[in-house]
Amino acid sequence: MADPLPEALGPLLREARARLVAAGVGDPALDARLIVEHFSGTTRTQAIADPERTIDSNAIAAIDAALGRRAGGEPVHRILGYREFYGLRLSLSPETLEPRPDTETLVEAVLPFVKAMAAREGTCRILDLGTGTGAIALALLSAVPAATATGVDISAGALATAARNAGELGLGGRFTTVQSDWFEKVSGRYHVIAANPPYIPTRDIGNLQDEVRDFDPRLALDGGVDGLNPYRIIAAEAARFLEAESRIAVEIGHTQRDEVTDIFKAAGYASVAALRDLGGNDRVLVFQWG
């Protein structure tokens, strides 16, 4: 059994880090700081300026439990219950994929088009397929006040999380949700269809990092036998929901650029752009109809 955690902030941070080092956590200093700050309500500045600051017993107990969860492999943002994405704080739930920085590449890929369309037409209607936390749609809405978005997900729990995030960010008036298996219950036409679909081949799910495999919902990971099923569905069905001038943007696995491009071209789309993520991997493809 671990020794009791110190009550003073500075020693508490050091002990939290030591526990995570011992557990083999990848970034123990950062995760320890995030956990201590979140559950104690303190800041990094306070830790530097007042390391002897006393932390109350309830916070100590919460930190102790959180460190145990992190040492057991649970991702730190699952423990905190939120993650930052494109400068927005998004709540997480068991039904949602944890949004990651690579997906910000998709936001950047379509943002100029969304801005231009909103400036010209007075609005830009966005459809976010598999919305999860609402990350993609809400990032675009936060950047373009004239835009509106519909978040689609098969999971009612994910949609509840996305709607809650929209409300907390003051974007609820421009964000609606539809529970649907892809386009099944979608109506209307959109200037942008965006998706970060499941793209992991079924056979590879077991080889994912523990933090992904054990805590992200399988529904948001499994793209079928070859990982390409969602792209086939989107390419086959999207055209009837698109405005005459429009874009489709999809996140892809880093080895899938050619295969996904071929799927969309075979369905009548033209390639507009291919973007890499911060790690230099192929990550986002943008298409237009015709």
UniProtKB/Swiss-Prot annotation:
One of its GO terms (biological process) is methylation. Pfam families: MTS (PF05175), PrmC_N (PF17827). Keywords: Methyltransferase, S-adenosyl-L-methionine, Transferase. GO terms for molecular function: nucleic acid binding; protein-(glutamine-N5) methyltransferase activity; protein-glutamine N-methyltransferase activity. Its EC number is 2.1.1.297. Substrate binds at residues 196-199. It catalyses: L-glutaminyl-[peptide chain release factor] + S-adenosyl-L-methionine = N(5)-methyl-L-glutaminyl-[peptide chain release factor] + S-adenosyl-L-homocysteine + H(+). InterPro entries: DNA_methylase_N6_adenine_CS, HemK-like, N5-glutamine_MTase, PrmC_N, RF_methyltr_PrmC, SAM-dependent_MTases_sf, Small_mtfrase_dom. S-adenosyl-L-methionine binds at residues 130-134, 153, 182, 196. It is an enzyme of class 2 (transferase). Transmembrane segments: none annotated. Belongs to the protein N5-glutamine methyltransferase family. PrmC subfamily. Methylates the class 1 translation termination release factors RF1/PrfA and RF2/PrfB on the glutamine residue of the universally conserved GGQ motif. PANTHER family: HEMK METHYLTRANSFERASE (PTHR18895), MTRF1L RELEASE FACTOR GLUTAMINE METHYLTRANSFERASE (PTHR18895:SF74). NCBIfam families: hemK_fam, RF_mod_PrmC. This is Release factor glutamine methyltransferase. It comes from Mesorhizobium japonicum (strain LMG 29417 / CECT 9101 / MAFF 303099).
